[in-house]
Amino acid sequence: MAKEKFERNKPHCNIGTIGHVDHGKTTLTAAITIILAKSGGATAKNYADIDAAPEEKARGITINTAHVEYETANRHYAHVDCPGHADYVKNMITGAAQMDGAILVVSAADGPMPQTREHILLARQVGVPALVVYMNKVDLVDDEELLELVEMEVRELLSSYDFPGDDIPITKGSAKVAIDGGDPVIGEQSILALMTTVDAYIPQPDRPIDLPFLMPVEDVFSISGRGTVVTGRIEKGVVKVGEEVEIVGIRAVQKTTCTGVEMFRKLLDQGQAGDNVGVLLRGTKREDVERGQVLCKPGSITPHTKFVAEAYILTKEEGGRHTPFFTNYRPQFYFRTTDVTGIIKLREGVEMIMPGDNAELDVELITPIAMDQGLRFAIREGGRTVGAGVVAKIVE
């Protein structure tokens, strides 16, 4: 039978496997592709294919990530799997591979381990909307009571990080048995059950075009007789000619009206997410707008200076700092299109942050930036990236 073409008409969702080292994340990823390939929903990949994850760069940081894609009856998925713990930390903090949901893999033989906890915390900090659990390696556990105990531990751990531990679906099985074609109850059927759960439990993300309009300002020009044009790539939503927009960040919020949208020197009646456009603003002077601000739907985003960040600090080998930093460290924070100086305060009981650490930091910027939870940024010193972070919580 000829293999069916990957249809792009199904809703798309980005997911990934997370969990402790050697609990079976990559084996599960391979098992999903192998089982779904039987119904034409994937190209089968073995463990070695996925484990040889290529290097990629995100915000100046090198990360190893494997990408596979597959589809169920309802959705098309892009799935990320990382070979090492440090890659997970970097991936989740930089948002290199966006996750709309994640499969937490826990070995039934070991139960939750330190990285299980750390990945759940990271998922919470970076705003992964939903998790499901695959309890792997049940073929190694004979005692039903032990499985119940592990399930209870996992649920308590999830609840302690504000995930709905009592409600999160847990699928029990063995990814290795599924790959080897062993007992279908814990093998193939568990993989199909997991995918049904992922389909049902991980909410369909909003498409960028359906979100409120936002465009980071990259450049500002003044066109005689027409007014001021700001250029940039629309990040989300749609802007239509005649609509009110706000200019947010760096200075006081200003309201103005979009009187024209142009792309490739052609006039359009609207611009949408993904478009590189020039937006003509009525009555706005060239000196009223600057790179680093955003154009947005009025009231949809506000400027802030104080926030809690989850950040990863590069190692010396990654081109980062050679020495630790202490409280009151003042680097630049690169948000969208511009650098803003900020002051970092370390948490109580934390003496210093070493290169290679990931940590929660309290940050205060010297000028306000349009931000919401989940916004990514780079930490820089004199134009060189020394870290990456995400806004975990806005303070003021």
Swiss-Prot record:
Gene of this entry: tuf2
Positions of Mg(2+) binding: T26
EC number in record: 3.6.5.3
UniProt cross-references to HAMAP family, sorted A to Z: EF_Tu_B
Name of the protein in question: Elongation factor Tu 2
SUPFAM superfamilies in UniProt: EF-Tu/eEF-1alpha/eIF2-gamma C-terminal domain, P-loop containing nucleoside triphosphate hydrolases, Translation proteins
Residue ranges of every copy of the tr-type G domain listed in the record: 10-206
Organism listed in the record: Caulobacter sp. (strain K31)
Family, similarity comment: Belongs to the TRAFAC class translation factor GTPase superfamily. Classic translation factor GTPase family. EF-Tu/EF-1A subfamily.
PANTHER family, alphabetized: ELONGATION FACTOR TU, MITOCHONDRIAL, ELONGATION FACTOR TU-RELATED
Residue span of region G3: 81-84
Location of region: G4: 136-139
